[in-house]
Amino acid sequence: MIKTAITKIAITNIAITNIAAVGLFPLIGSLTPALEPIALAQTSPTPVRVDRLISQNDSANSSIKLVEQANSLREQNQLDRALTLYRQAIAASPELVPAYYGLGVTLRQKGDIQGAINAHRQAITIDKSYTPAYYGLGIALYQKGDSSGAIDAYQQFIQLSKADTNLAPAYYNLGLAYERRNNIDEAVASFRKAIEFDPKYALAHNGLGTVLRRQGNRKEAIAAYRKAIELAPQYAVAHFALGISLYEDRDYTGAIEAYKRVTTLEPNFPNVYYNLGLAYNQLSDRPNAIATFRKAIEQDPRNADIYAILGSVFLRDENIPEAAEAFKRSTEINPKVASSFNGLGLALRRQGDLEGAISAYQKSIAINPNYAVAYNNLGRVLSDQNRNTEAIAAFRRAIAIDAQNAVAYSNLGNLLRSQGNSDEAIDAFQKTIAIGKEDLWVDYTSLGLAYADRGRLGEAQNAYFKALSLNPNFAKAHFGLGALYTLKGEVSNAIRSYQEALKLYEENRDAEWIKRTQQAIQALQGIT
């Protein structure tokens, strides 16, 4: 699964980025993204002035100077010294609202979110018209996880603000809070409102892209991300988000370009190499996919997901030892992921380690007892060991969990037929075909063989014809048809079908079936 969760907190413009990974890439599964960019605009749109508060009272004037000094220290990131001065100002002038506001901002910067909330609320209690405190309260409540409270605070700020105030940051933050509440329509409206106030506000365009994507409006989301990038070409988060949407739009080349831009801007940007590897993999560019996943591992060596997808790529690349090692490492890092043990089982079976494969599948099933894919794969390896009763039970369990598992029906049918149970095999193949899967010509051929076993030659012939209509170059269907014509006494047709099968087997250099087909032709030529 593509990594999509983005968490970003921006102080002033774009400052601190933290991207959290979500999900994993299963061997069999769908893309389930969850992009959530969080980039709070944290400087109040309303200028915080204390010079207007100058009074004839020496004590008050002294407190105001303390606040001014504290503000300067806070801007220099000398937070502890700033806190001391804000508290001195409050002690001297308990009604000095800017001191409480500055205290709240500084406490939030120090990570004391509840302290910040209390300070902003105290400022509002003293002066309900002091708009910066509502803005600061909204930020602190959002960071605490109280999105509803943040929405109320931002709305109060907007209502109390003067007409000439640039409300773009407030509407942007309001959009983030609505998005977190899953109120996507209001989030879209808020981000659009932010853009109305400031058409060049890159964060707002990026936020708009995020919620449009969640609405399923991918084309507009891509346009919004591109606009954010146009306004802020160095904005790595927007490039990353664009890459995700392009990937989902199956524009893998475009996604690669976007992710590569991220690596240029921020080489240590979390998950970018993982997602870049996925895009290469979709283009079947396995060398670049493998190299990129290795880069992702260098960046995050304890990420089991990366080892799992790397194992999958190695498996498809027929590099079985590397696949087994990657899946094994994935299961060591995180032994609670069923799909990783399933992948390990696939690799071990290909290495001939059947007992190891069985153990891996059993661990997969222990983690997820409803994992139909693992039961199907367990059935295959049990069948390899001629433990046919257990294999049949495993295939039936896969089907019981997932009645649409065409592969399990197909495997069950082949095993039942090999056990002489052609009637049940016919039923299994028919269900496979009804559900549908890749390479159905194989299943039509198997169905034809099962019909022939039962003497239902007309139905067998139709099944072979259907197989060849789907894949005219499937040698086993031609061979099966040759055997059928032989049973019907149609020698010339039989020879013709066998000769077509022989040509295809020779192209594939299948020595065993070349010999069998030659023997069948020779036997018929002796009849003519």
PLM segments and residue spans:
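Terminal, low-structured helical/coil segments at or just beyond the last alpha-helical repeat
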Residues: 44-57, 487, 493-528
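Canonical tetratricopeptide repeat
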Residues: 68, 102, 136, 173, ...
